[in-house]
Regions:
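Amphipathic alpha-helical and helix-coil boundary elements used as assembly
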Residues: 1-823
């Protein structure tokens, strides 16, 4: 009956015996005939030894084939026994029906009603049935059975993945030598055993089967009480009688019976004719003689096989159904769009499973929840071999809940599903990329598109291979952030898109930052060089421009210094050029060179660089800023132009003159604490077109080249000359004494007093473990050396500021920090 029902269903967290019990109970409950004529009896020796399995699947198997597979895997033997068990009491052989008996210990089997059976001729005159034929049968079997099963949870524990069992049976001297060369090495499905001990037991099962099959006995006779699954004692056989008592007891393992009814001849003939018409041929039983030696017809004859009692009876290794590829749906708890464990495994439901087959487990197996399967591995196109998560490499593309997946079965075992692919379907078609049309309009596009959990946004890698318009895009819907490469277009609709540029584009509706510990080179120079791409930091043109910059700066600066201008300092510029030259030190292009200590940023272009902003542009250097132009340096301000220096300003024009004009407003030139010299190689002209030219000083002295002079102030006015004085005027007017008050500007005495602020570098932890960005350093001792040769000590307060350093002019300072006596 069980052969007639084929099913596909899932069992969770049950042992093989639990499942067999469940199936038999289902048959008995659903079928009134079987309920009264069929039952299951499990030998007490089995107990609860079988571990629970997370996942066992019946796949397109009959219930009978499925039960056989489960029992064979655990090495559990079975037979059918006439009669039904009486719950809590002995079996009722008189009851109409059969019992499926499961056992693994032959010593627990019942003794046959025949008890001791003689080896003797079987004649009608004999008072007891006897065995008339007896022979021992030996079959060469492997001397070792090995079992290997991959354990992906402990991949480095190879020694626990293989178990080997040597035969304890005796196959004779030559038989043992032959068996020693035979090793049944079987590679099973992964993770076959629940534990290492369980794997050893499964390996022992196969060896026990070979020991069982190595030696058996064939017999025949007329013993009507013989039955499979029961043992008897054989007597009267000379060879058997020579063995110890325990080796004269045998368990019947199979039986073939021919029985004839004692009907009258004319009725018997009609019965034979009826059997013939129904295809029931007696030829199958021709191996049995129709009469004994006296010529009398034999009414009953049996041919049987048996093994010595005590030999473990074990069925052969199961043949798994090896299902083809199957479709499944990824499942998970409610409100979880992605559900996995630390190994990236997911839960699945096979759509073919029926709810009515899983009511015993509360629907687990067909509930569309994470109870429908054990964790199932997901195959990846790339999986690394590193220990631990953070050092690992590989591709991680977990199927979300609801995804259709393609399932293969490791080792062909339905109990070992593996997801090998994810599938689109009518309800879940292939994704369209951001703002782009779907298939088939964008059939030239390929890539990856993710989806925000509990949202509609996503991230994507899009490769567009449209003829003549290839491009790549790495993008996130958050802030519209995109990196576009190649032939840039608007989103494709209907297979076409408007062009919007070529090259590369990084864009975002939020911030963009570039961080590089060695430096950044922004260059618009075209790289040349045949099939070579050119160096990453190719900068020959840039270095040439920097060299020209330094030469011009030094040449004009030195010339200015020779003509009373302030000298220029090009050391910082020269050091920067040197760092740019050594930029690649320690890299793969210059592995033997020393690595530069400080990162730099270079910006260069052959046709110009433009900076523009609707608000402020701030440029600052803790050292020098050198701005050099080979031709014109033009600074323009729509309103004020302020130029401030802490230690001198020098303006030098080698040619073309120096022009300073205040078109509207006052022109103010002051030397507040020192002299003012205005020199001209030719003429000096001071004019006041509409006002008064006023020269005010404590003493005014006008001196001509020939020695003539006019001195005003510090006493009476004095004129002097080696030449006669000459006056041109119509008259001389003399009046009372009179003077004017000179108006002098007031110059303040403010110095360059400063307080130093000491801060931690970003990332340096404080005493409490915090890592603030630029947190102040409290109570630090400072040794300060100034460029005027003076030195002092100071201490930072709770705000990180030092004591006030008072100086009349600005100076460069070298600072040493000490804390706790350490510098």
């Amino acid at each position: 009956m069980m052969e007639g029902r084929t099913n596909t269903r899932v069992f969770r967290n049950q042992s093989e015996l639990d499942i067999v019990k469940l199936l038999v109970d289902e048959w008995r409950k659903r079928n009134g005939v079987l309920r009264s004529t069929f039952d299951l009896e499990i030998n007490a020796s089995l107990g609860s030894r079988s571990p629970q399995r997370e996942f066992i699947m019946q796949h397109n198997e009959s219930d009978a084939a499925f039960i056989r597979r489960l029992l064979q895997r655990r090495g559990i033997a079975w037979f059918f026994q006439s009669g039904l068990p009486r719950r809590g009491e002995q079996r009722r052989p008189e009851a109409i029906g059969h019992t499926l008996v499961l056992f693994d210990d032959p010593n627990q089997l019942a003794r046959n009603a025949a008890g001791s059976v003689r080896f003797h001729r079987d004649a009608a005159t004999e008072q007891r049935d006897s065995i008339t034929g007896w022979s021992a049968v030996r079959m060469a079997q492997p001397g070792q059975a090995s079992l290997h099963t991959w354990d992906y949870k402990q991949p480095r524990g190879r020694e626990f993945m293989t178990t080997s069992t040597r035969s304890r049976g005796n196959q004779g001297k030559q038989g043992n030598e032959l068996a020693a060369a035979l090793d049944d090495y079987h590679v099973a499905a992964p993770h076959l055993g629940d534990t290492a001990r369980d794997l050893v037991e499964l390996g022992d099962v196969q060896m026990a089967h070979y020991e069982y099959a190595a030696k058996s006995f064939h017999g025949e006779g007329g013993v009507r009480d013989l039955a499979v699954g029961e043992w008897f004692r054989l007597t009267g056989h000379s060879e058997i009688d020579s063995h110890p008592d325990n080796e004269r007891e045998f368990v019947v393992t199979s039986q073939h019976i021919v029985a004839r009814n004692n009907l009258p001849v004319e009725i018997g003939t009609r019965v034979e004719r009826l059997f013939s018409h129904n295809g029931w041929s007696a030829d199958d039983y021709g191996v049995f003689a129709n009469s004994d030696h006296s010529g009398e017809p034999i009414r009953y004859k049996t041919r049987f096989t048996c093994v010595r009692r005590g030999i473990r009876i074990v069925p052969p290794r199961p043949t798994v159904p090896r299902p083809a590829l199957q479709t499944a749906i990824v499942v998970g708890p409610a409100n979880d769009e992605v559900w996995c464990d630390e190994l990236g495994r997911v839960k699945i439901r096979f759509p073919a499973t029926r709810p009515e087959d899983h009511t015993h487990a509360g629907g687990a197996g067909s509930s569309d929840t994470d109870a429908d399967s054990a964790w199932v591995r997901v195959a990846s196109s790339w999986a690394g071999s590193a220990l631990g998560t953070h050092g690992q490499c590989g591709a991680r593309l977990l199927p979300p809940v609801g995804t259709e997946v393609l399932v293969e079965f490791a080792g062909g075992d339905p109990d070992r599903p593996i997801i090998i692919a994810q599938m689109f379907n009518g309800a879940a078609p292939p994704p369209a990329f951001r703002h782009e049309a779907g298939l088939p309009d964008t059939k030239y596009q390929s890539g990856i598109r993710s989806r925000e959990v509990q949202g509609q946004r996503g991230n994507q890698l899009r490769l567009d291979d449209t003829p003549g318009q290839i491009s790549a895009q790495l993008a996130s819907d958050h802030a519209g952030t995109e990196l576009n490469l190649g032939y840039l277009t608007e989103p494709r609709q209907g297979g076409s898109a408007a062009p919007r540029g070529e090259g590369a584009e990084l864009r975002s509706e939020e911030a963009i930052a570039l961080h590089a510990a060695r430096g950044i080179l922004l260059s618009a120079w075209k790289l040349l060089g045949g099939g070579r791409k050119g160096g990453q930091l190719a900068r020959d043109d840039y270095l040439e421009l920097l060299r020209e910059c330094g030469e011009l700066c030094a040449a004009l600066g030195n010339h200015a210094a020779e003509h009373n201008g302030m000298p220029v300092d090009t050391r910082e510029q020269d050091e920067l050029l040197a760092r740019f030259k050594k930029w690649e030190g320690g890299s793969n292009t210059m592995p033997d060179a020393a690595e530069p200590g400080e990162p730099v940023i270079g910006i260069t272009s052959p046709a110009g660089i433009g900076f523009a902003s609707t608000k402020a542009i701030v440029s600052y250097s803790a050292r020098d800023i050198d701005t050099v132009a080979q031709q014109h340096l033009q600074l323009t301000a729509g309103q004020r132009f302020s130029l401030n220096a802490g230690k001198g300003i020098s303006l030098f024009a080698h040619n073309g003159g120096l022009t300073g004009i205040a078109h509207a407003g006052k022109l103010l030139l002051q030397s507040q604490h020192d002299d003012t010299d205005i020199n001209s190689a030719k003429n000096l002209k001071l004019t006041a077109t509409e006002g008064t030219a006023t020269i005010a000083a404590k003493v005014i002295l006008l001196v001509a080249e020939d020695g003539s002079f006019l001195k005003l102030g510090d006493g009476p006015p004095v004129m002097g000359s080696k030449q006669p004085l000459k006056f041109h005027a119509p008259d001389f007017l003399y009046d009372e004494p009179e003077s004017m008050t000179a108006q002098f500007p007031t110059f303040g005495q403010a110095g360059a007093d400063q307080k130093l602020v000491v801060r931690y570098a970003p990332g340096i932890p404080l005493e409490n473990g915090e890592r603030p960005a630029g947190g102040v350093v409290k109570d630090a001792k400072l040794k300060i050396a100034l460029s005027d040769g003076s030195a002092m000590q100071a201490r930072s307060g709770i705000d990180g500021k030092s004591d006030l350093i008072e100086r009349g002019a600005m100076h460069m300072a070298e600072i040493g920090l000490m804390r706790g006596g350490d510098q």
